[in-house]
Amino acid sequence: MATGSTELLIGWCIFGVLLLAILAFCWVYVRKYQSHQESEVISTITAISSLAIALITSALLPVDIFLVSFMKNHNGTFKDWAENNDTRIQIENTVLIGYYTLYSIILFCVFLWIPFVYFYYEEKDDTDGSHCSQIGSALKYTSGFVLVCSCLLLIGAFAPLDIPSKANATELDKIKLLFQNLGSSNGLAALSFSISSLTLIGMLAAITYTAYGMSALPLNLIKGKRNAHYERLENSEDIEEVEQQVENIKSKCKDGRPLSSKDRQALYKLQEKLRTLKRKDRHLEHHENNCWTKCCLVMRPFKIVWGILFILVALLFIVSLFLSNLDKALHSAGINTGFIIFGTNLTNPLNILLPVLQTVFPLDYIFITTITMYFIFTSMAGIRNMGIWFFWIRLYKIRRRRTRPQALLFLCMILLLIVLHTSYMIYSLAPQYVMYGSQKYLWENNSTQETAIGNSSALVLKDCDASAPEDQCTVTRTYLFLHKFWFFSSIYYFGNWAFIVVFVIGLIVSCCKGKKSVIEGEVEDDDSDLSDDEDHP
């Protein structure tokens, strides 16, 4: 038991180190994109905290898998310290408490704290009222989110997971079953339903941003950016052309005649365009003479290598996701079970790799962290390229050192939801690994063998799957949270197909696009000249 406790302690210590690394990453990440002129302490802390909570929750996944796998020997028997079922339940409950705590904090952030901070700064920008009036208005709008959260918790608590299978079951029987469900783990069901609903939104965000970013990020690294010198020459020609057009319009009023409304409107547009072109010229001049630009030329081969590596990883994910979904389509128990599969019929690369890495702790920890960070970076690439949209309305643009507090909160909210969906994405890629880790069990073969003594049954060592006996294999708490309601799993299944389609479309679009400007995102028509100070302090 002492050895087991020591190794369990090591697992939790690595989780603690990862927690500190997550906090450091979130701080650097948020500070990189927030506007230094409009930065606010509360919005910064909120963005860092919400993103960190999501990443910490995803970091519990390998701990959960490690604990259930560590309980068993390679020969399929439980270790001495884990033979007692109460001990196993106690260990798993520590993970369950962790999930309860973190998921509750996520609900608090999504439905109360982030909306409140967002609406507070919206009111601050729109009105010059007192702090009390701003807080009152923010609370009024936030109450709608609290109402939605309450409804989700109630639906999750009261929605029965099963219905009587008998044809002659009365409505009274169904109501009795409903209250029986309420009496057992209704808190878990309520929290699971709420988190699954958020994960569903995260799935839509992943389809929109992550799938596109997985193709856009590597191809942008491979193609590189335009040459600053030649881009500046083209911009100088555009400046001369616009200046000539401005002079032509102004020449019409040299004799004292006023300009027509059409000419005044055209002159205003040309002057705005000229202002933008001159700002663009200043930025191009800065990049042309900057030492960092010259260093980037030296680093160009490394960027190409990273781009090739990223596109190979993306293809590995897509192929694994396709094979996993195809396996569910051909061999699952059907849509009413959430497309659950018994065993693995079509193997995919990640489903083979993860159980192998899991035997050498903490290789799977590192791999899961890498997958999560990969999703973060590709999602960020998709958001940066597309901006934050609400249907056909573009709400915010995400730019380095230019992102407003409200946009930063939106950004971290989207990333939080995408990270929540990452756990299900990993399950889609390696369902056996997420459910049981590397657990094995001894299965008694029904066929008998004749021996000198008599007939005897053969014991076969098998990997744990959904058809395994409950007393022989321990299911991870992650799986219980993700698959408490079968209809969410069915929606995720179809969402995976949509993810694959969007990735292919994004890959084609990214291949057809040309190189990006060296000052991409630095100059926009709605920027002021003062915003240059943020780029060139």
Swiss-Prot record:
Major location (coarse): endoplasmic reticulum
A Gene Ontology molecular function term of the record: cobalamin binding
UniProt-listed GO biological process terms: insulin receptor internalization; protein localization to lysosome
UniProt xrefs under InterPro entries: LMBD1_LysCbl_Transport, LMBR1-like_membr_prot
Glycan-bearing residues: N75, N85, N168, N345, N445, N446, N455
Domain of life, source organism: Eukaryota
Family indicated by similarity: Belongs to the LIMR family. LMBRD1 subfamily.
SS bonds (residue pairs): none
Protein known as: Lysosomal cobalamin transport escort protein LMBD1
Transmembrane feature ranges: 8-28, 48-68, 99-119, 143-163, 187-207, 304-324, 363-383, 407-427, 485-505
Pfam families, per database record: LMBR1 (PF04791)
Side Cytoplasmic, residues: 29-47, 120-142, 208-303, 384-406, 506-537
Protein topology in the membrane: Multi-pass membrane protein
Location in or out of the cell: Endoplasmic reticulum membrane; Lysosome membrane; Cell membrane
Reported function: Lysosomal membrane chaperone required to export cobalamin (vitamin B12) from the lysosome to the cytosol, allowing its conversion to cofactors. Targets ABCD4 transporter from the endoplasmic reticulum to the lysosome. Then forms a complex with lysosomal ABCD4 and cytoplasmic MMACHC to transport cobalamin across the lysosomal membrane. May play a role in mediating and regulating the internalization of the insulin receptor.
Topology Extracellular: residue spans: 1-7, 69-98, 164-186, 325-362, 428-484
Keywords recorded for this protein, A-Z: Cell membrane, Cobalamin, Cobalt, Endoplasmic reticulum, Glycoprotein, Lysosome, Membrane, Transmembrane, Transmembrane helix, Transport
Lineage of the organism: Eukaryota, Metazoa, Chordata, Craniata, Vertebrata
GO-annotated cellular components: clathrin-coated endocytic vesicle; endoplasmic reticulum membrane; lysosomal membrane; plasma membrane
